[in-house]
C-alpha cells in the first residue's frame, strides 16, 4: 500500500492506494468517529462491493443507500434520496457517509455529507479510474443543473480516500479509457516526464497491469494533491486542472448528461484546447499531434460531436464556472507540461478553434 497526504491543516487527510483495501477495517476505523455509517453506492457497484465493505464495517450500524447509476441521475431528485435515507434511519451528527462508486456517487455523497445537519464526515472509496485519479481528491462535491454541469455544490474535504485498485478489474473498458483522459491531463498541465512515461506504458495500463496502474494512479493523485494543497478553492492554480473541461462540459450538457462519459468529453475538449494553444503559437502542431495520438491510444474520442455548432459551444461555455465578470476564461497550454488560465485571447482564435475540422486534423494520426 502507498499513502499520500493532502495537507490542508486541520482538514488534512490520507490517500491510500493498493489492492483489496476495501477489506482493511483499520483504514476506516481511524476516520470514523461515531457508530453510524451510511454507504452511498449505486445499482451497478452494490452487487460487486457493497457486501464486502459492509463486512469490513461490521462493527458499526450500517445503512446502505443504493442509487440509480449514471450521470443523468446526478440531480436534486437523487440527492433527496440520500437525505431521505439518512433521516429515515435517524442518523445523527456523528454519522460518517462513505461514497462507494465512481465520480457521480462521490460528488453526490460528498454534497450530502456537506449539507446533512450542516456537515458530517465522509470517506471516499472510488471504484472507477476517473474517480480514483481525480474526483475523489480535493473536496469538490455537487450535482448538475439542466443549464450546466456541477453548478450546484460545495468544497468539502473527505476524512480519507481509500483507493482499491482491484476494483478496476470489474470496470468496463470504456470507463477505463474515460479515466485515462484525466490521467493524461496531468502530464499535459504539469508533468511532461509523466506524459513520456504514459506514452511508454499506456498499453500496460489498459491491460490492467497492476504495477503500471498503481504508478499511474499514484502519480496522478500526487499531482492533484500538490495543486489542492496550494489552492484548495480554485482561486488560482487549481483551475488548470480543468484543461479541456470548458469545451468538455459544453459537450456533456448539450448532448445530455451520460451520453458522452465525462472523460470522453474531456478528451475531445482537450483536443480543442490543444488546437487553440497551437493557434496562439504557444505549442507547435507536433506537440498537439503528440497529445492527440496518446488520447487515441487510450481509446478516447478526439473529435467533438458533429451535431454541435460553434454557437452551441458558446452558449454552454457562457455558464462555465471560470467565467468572471462575463468574461470567458480557458485553460490552455503555454508549453507541454505547463498550463495557464486565461481570458486574454482574440475572439477570432476561439471562433477558429470551434469551427476547425477535427476529423481531418486527426484522421491521419492513427491509433
UniProtKB/Swiss-Prot annotation:
Protein name (database record): 3-dehydroquinate synthase
Keywords: Amino-acid biosynthesis, Aromatic amino acid biosynthesis, Cobalt, Cytoplasm, Lyase, Metal-binding, NAD, Nucleotide-binding, Zinc
GO biological process entries: amino acid biosynthetic process; aromatic amino acid family biosynthetic process; chorismate biosynthetic process
Source organism of this protein record: Stutzerimonas stutzeri (strain A1501)
Pfam families per UniProt: DHQ_synthase, DHQS_C
Assigned EC number: 4.2.3.4
Family: Belongs to the sugar phosphate cyclases superfamily. Dehydroquinate synthase family.
Entry-linked InterPro entries: Dehydroquinate_synthase (IPR050071), DHQ_synth_AroB (IPR016037), DHQ_synth_fam (IPR030963), DHQS/DOIS_N (IPR030960), DHQS_C (IPR056179)
Cellular component terms per the entry's GO annotation: cytoplasm
Cofactor(s) this protein requires: Co(2+); Zn(2+); NAD(+)
Binding residues for Zn(2+): 182, 245, 262
Reaction catalyzed: 7-phospho-2-dehydro-3-deoxy-D-arabino-heptonate = 3-dehydroquinate + phosphate
Note on how the cofactor is bound: Binds 1 divalent metal cation per subunit. Can use either Co(2+) or Zn(2+).
GO molecular function: 3-dehydroquinate synthase activity; metal ion binding; nucleotide binding
Compartments in which it is found: Cytoplasm
Record: residues binding NAD(+): 69-74, 103-107, 127-128, 140, 149, 167-170
